[in-house]
Amino acid sequence: MNVNEFSNEFDVLYNNIMSNAAPGLNEYEKSVLLTKAQEEIVKNYFEPAGNKYGKGLDDSPKRQIDFSELIKVGEGVLNTSAPTITFDKRAKVYDLPADLFLVINEAVDTNAGTKQIVPISYSDYTRLMSRPYKEPVKYQAWRIITTSINNISVELIVNSNETITDYKVRYIRRPAPIITTNLSSEYGDVTINGVSTVSECELNPIIHSEILQRAVELAKAAYQGDLQASVELGQRSE
């Protein structure tokens, strides 16, 4: 459906679910809710724990089709302006693509061949460094999220005698916001994810109705101030 259909059907569902008891929402408010609903659905489709079927992107060909418009392959860029001191002396800091939303998989090329990236937490790092052998196993490298002001950055760790030559990421990019009207002309200097003009939904039309339903449920929970309902929205029908 296009943005006009999103807006009109939102009004119908919202009025039905609220029995016309709640005040109507303007186009900016509807756009915020539709965009939030879209991002929540993408996350819940991606994470098995986020949906009632317990299936993630890899478990369902349908989900892979739903997200095909958003899947990209990009390269991380070595951050030469990062602090020269890293927690691990083997680590190199790379900036991830600016439009990255969720990582699917990643790999590095080194002078010893291609290594698959294994994301590790800070506690994982402590545990691994407590072992006698403190290197990634063969064909693997480690990745830790690190501090960055303007970018999403990671520290990549390979074996001490190896050098990274390239870092590739397959990922789901952040979908464009769903904006039903020109925000700058209607509401002044406001944007959603940096966008102020009309913006259509990029996702497969198959899940447009789910986005719409989620947005209406978010609106209902926000109006009623129902914390429990807001929590339950984290796992719905995806």
UniProtKB/Swiss-Prot annotation:
**Where is it found, in Gene Ontology cellular component terms?**
virion component
Q: Where is the protein situated, by its record's location annotation?
A: Virion
State the superkingdom: Viruses
Keyword Transport included in the entry's annotation: no
Is Transport among this UniProt entry's keywords? Answer: no
Q: What UniProt keywords are attached to this protein's entry?
A: Virion
Where is the major localization of this protein? virion
Q: What does this protein do?
A: Forms the tail multi-ring barrel with ring protein 1, ring protein 2 and ring protein 3.
Q: Other remarks? A: The barrel is composed of five stacked dodecameric ring structures. Rings 4 and 5 are both composed of gp34. Podoviridae-like phages usually possess only one such ring. The tail is thus rather long.
- From the Swiss-Prot or TrEMBL record, give the protein name: Ring protein 4/5
Question: Which organism is the protein's source?
Answer: Bacteroides phage crAss001 (Bacteroides phage PhiCrAss001)
